[in-house]
Amino acid sequence: MKYDNLLDRFIKYVKVNTRSDPDSETTPSTESQEAFALTILKPEMEAIGLQDVHYNPVNGYLIGTLPANNPTLTRKIGFIAHMDTADFNAENVNPQIIDNYQGGDITLGSSNYKLDPKAFPNLNNYIGQTLITTDGTTLLGADDKSGIAEIMTAIEFLTSQPQIEHCDIKVAFGPDEEIGVGADKFEVADFEVDFAYTMDGGPLGELQYETFSAAALEVTFLGRNVHPGTAKDQMINALQLAIDFHEKLPAKERPEYTDGYQGFYHLTGLTGTVEEARASYIIRDFEEASFEARKVKVENIAQSMNAQLGTKRVLVELNDQYYNMKKVIEKDMTAIELAKEVMEELTIKPVIEPIRGGTDGSKISFMGIPTPNIFAGGENMHGRFEFVSLQTMERAVDVIIGLVCKA
């Protein structure tokens, strides 16, 4: 179905810079996210008929309710999307609208960048559709403002069509998903639902209830700096220790060599001097045993290097971030079966594959609310080549409406 306000709403949202900050210690991590919630989303939620709209400054979540208009629809369903965007320029987002895309290259504004089907064959799935792209200088922010726009549009449709019967609906827009802490302070008591969905997936049909299990690894290397002219048998180069550590990890177990259910070690940062260096990694895997084995491996590498050095110069700090929500959702597949049924009725083929990443739903599921993930439409997310199809967004709205009417 076409929805008159969906495109304009999405464009309005993406023009607001809500980039999160991994180095911040506040919640939300950036003031712009709170401003977006309070000055744009909250008034709009109230205007379209959501009730009890309130912002929690402790956890950064904006929540609203649409009560059921049919008492026989007894389920309570939640929909969640995140306000922040990824670690890429989000200032002065200037979306391009490509009507009736007919294939071929899309020049991104006046930049030297283009969307080329040879580099991005997923473009070929969108012939004849309306695409929203960047101008080549920023990301787009479809991750996850497409999800916000879809939820808002579905609520607006339901409140404007009171004859359409639906169950109790909760809506939550949260911060800092992109930096992995968005759901850390989520309050289940403020979101009383039987299950929920994050609208944070990619192409049409995605329905996901398996995520990575994730850990952050920080390794500090302590060197000993002396003049290089007299360094023999004295200098210990911390940067070289970092290189040695990295080379002991399996070379083929990096993101660029893995897919499907394969896990990886990913070096995300390396800084330092001869005296001291620091390497940042993320560790990802799907199965609990292999996830734990990866953590044991890095500990063993550090121990081996320290034994060889004769002193403790490789210091490992490991912190689990989130776990594969499959463990929770498999206990009750109601949310998945309902979504599959609705999609199939809408002639959308459910694409059930693992998320090679995480969502806020990962943590929220372990808090007691099963929260799988549904497509929101974004492609090539987190950079200047990001785009989204208006038609896919419309279909996501259809799914939301179908879910609450069938509950």
UniProtKB/Swiss-Prot annotation:
GO biological process, one term: proteolysis
Any single Gene Ontology cellular-component annotation: cytosol
Residue runs in coiled coils: none
Subcellular location: Cytoplasm
Sorted UniProt keywords: Aminopeptidase, Cytoplasm, Hydrolase, Metal-binding, Metalloprotease, Protease, Zinc
Positions of Zn(2+) 2 binding: D143, E178, H382
Pfam families registered for this protein in UniProt: M20_dimer, Peptidase_M20
Recorded GO MF terms: metallopeptidase activity; tripeptide aminopeptidase activity; zinc ion binding
Catalysed reactions, as listed in the record: Release of the N-terminal residue from a tripeptide
Entry binding sites for Zn(2+) 1: H82, D143, D200
Cofactor note: Binds 2 Zn(2+) ions per subunit.
Active site: D84, E177 (proton acceptor)
Entries under CDD domains matching the protein: M20_peptT
SUPFAM superfamilies for the chain: Bacterial exopeptidase dimerisation domain (SSF55031), Zn-dependent exopeptidases (SSF53187)
InterPro entries on file: ArgE/DapE_CS (IPR001261), Bact_exopeptidase_dim_dom (IPR036264), Peptidase_M20 (IPR002933), Peptidase_M20_dimer (IPR011650), Peptidase_M20B (IPR010161)
EC numbers, comma separated: 3.4.11.4
Needed co-factor(s): Zn(2+)
Family, per entry: Belongs to the peptidase M20B family.
HAMAP family assigned: Aminopeptidase_M20
Job of this protein: Cleaves the N-terminal amino acid of tripeptides.
Designated name of the protein: Peptidase T
